[in-house]
Amino acid sequence: MIDKEALEFRLERLVYSQNMLSAWKRSKKEFIDKYIRRIFWSDDSQLDREYEENMSYGRDFHLMCQRILLGIEPIRSKSEFDRDLDRDLDRVRKIYRLYRERYGHDLSFLPEYTIELKDRIQVTYDLLIKIYEGGKLTRLDIWDWKTERKKIEKSNAEMKMQTRLYMYVCKESIGVDLECENIRMYYYQPAIDWQVMVDYTEDKHLSNRNMIYST
């Protein structure tokens, strides 16, 4: 058991991510076990091993995407696993090329970009794109890579804690001088070449603020 004083000490120093806020909403016990007591477990079942394999693929994919967007080509392999990875990375390269063809150099790519608000809320974007016109920031596009194959529907994407937190933090920081309508978030599933776009409004921003700080 963790005593009340130790619990309060750790809570006061936590920086809250999307996963942490989601865990808190689901179960206070899960949150305390995972983020305060730091209890993690594995049952070594087939399902558990498959989960670890998927997580490993996801980590590799995100790392390779970061390299591509920084202009560092990933190493290619001939294994079946890496052929899937190469295919998925080629689809991310296509997104990069389309932006370059449309906006030229009037944009900047920020892969694995972390923002922390002063009230200890933190997010790390897979990719944040700043789009400029005449040297002035005019739009922000958030991209999140999803390696699972189950199709993400727009209605579900709009209600995800991740969506609401990522868009809120973006508006409160880099996008503070932008209209909400100039901030967008995209979920992209390269394995099935599926993309969902979520737009933003002032009403959504106020709703997200209320949801986040009442969690």
What is each of the regions a protein language model found here?
Residues 1-130:
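Metal-dependent nuclease catalytic cores that hydrolyze phosphodiester bonds in DNA/RNA
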Residues 32-33, 40-41, 150-152, 193-196:
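Short catalytic/ligand-binding loop motif for oxyanion handling, primarily in non-cytosolic enzymes
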Residues 50-55, 137-141, 180-184, 210:
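Glycine-rich, flexible loop segments associated with nucleotide phosphate handling
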Residues 56, 60, 158-161, 165, ...:
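Generic recognition of stable, solvent-exposed alpha-helical segments in well-folded globular domains
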Residues 67-71, 168-173:
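Active-site catalytic microenvironments for nucleophilic, acid-base chemistry
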Residues 104-107, 136-137, 176-182:
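Short helix-terminating capping/connector loops at secondary-structure junctions
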Residues 111, 170-215:
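Metal-dependent nuclease catalytic regions and adjoining charged, substrate-binding loops involved
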